[in-house]
């Protein structure tokens, strides 16, 4: 049975992990739960934290197996997929997925709010703004929820392929 592990800060990653686990008939556990030493596939989900994705570090610590990493963030999904930042972080054999998340300024920690204010100020000052820049500016200081469980279809398919179910 596939293993699902996640790290969540504001909740959207946990929502995705639990829904994926439900679809696959397993349980989603946080990073504190060890992954059994078996040959079952592993899907690891975490938010994007600036240039780092905690799921990558966690997945690298696990015994060799089929692994997929899902980065949950607020970059427009089409931009995240075209940039494919995970490609330079993980082996080519790993599955790489990008899921739209949620950002809730109403519950955000003050340090994160300050970081976002700085980033948005820099982006606002750019003379030529991309669609992603405009998106970031428009959601500044607003609770935004882009969670879309249909985005899990590709990960579910990846798992089922590895279990010879498709």
Question: Which sequence ranges carry the predicted segments?
Answer:
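Charged/polar, solvent-exposed surface patches and flexible loops
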Residues: 22, 58-61, 84-88, 117, ...
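Generic secondary-structure boundary/loop-capping signal
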Residues: 7, 45, 100, 137, ...
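N-terminal beta1-alpha1-beta2 submodule of the flavodoxin-like/Rossmannoid cofactor-binding fold
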Residues: 1-62, 160-166
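Helix-loop-strand module that forms the ligand-binding subsite of alpha/beta enzymes
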Residues: 32-111
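Glycine-rich phosphate/pyrophosphate-binding loop and the adjoining helix
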Residues: 115-166
């Amino acid at each position: 049975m596939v293993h699902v592990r996640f790290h969540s800060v504001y909740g959207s990653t946990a929502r995705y992990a639990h829904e994926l686990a439900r679809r696959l008939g397993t349980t989603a556990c946080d990073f504190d739960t060890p992954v059994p030493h078996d040959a079952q596939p592993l899907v690891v989900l975490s938010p994007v934290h600036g240039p780092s994705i905690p799921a990558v570090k966690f997945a690298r610590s696990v015994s060799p197996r089929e692994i997929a990493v899902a980065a949950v963030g607020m970059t427009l999904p089409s931009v995240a997929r075209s940039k494919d930042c995970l490609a330079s972080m993980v082996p080519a054999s790993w599955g790489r997925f990008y899921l739209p998340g949620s950002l809730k300024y109403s519950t955000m920690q003050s340090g994160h709010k300050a970081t976002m204010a700085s980033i948005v100020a820099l982006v606002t000052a750019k003379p030529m703004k991309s669609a992603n820049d405009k998106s970031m500016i428009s959601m500044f200081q607003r609770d935004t929820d882009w969670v879309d469980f249909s985005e899990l279809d590709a990960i579910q398919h990846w798992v089922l392929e590895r279990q010879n179910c498709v």
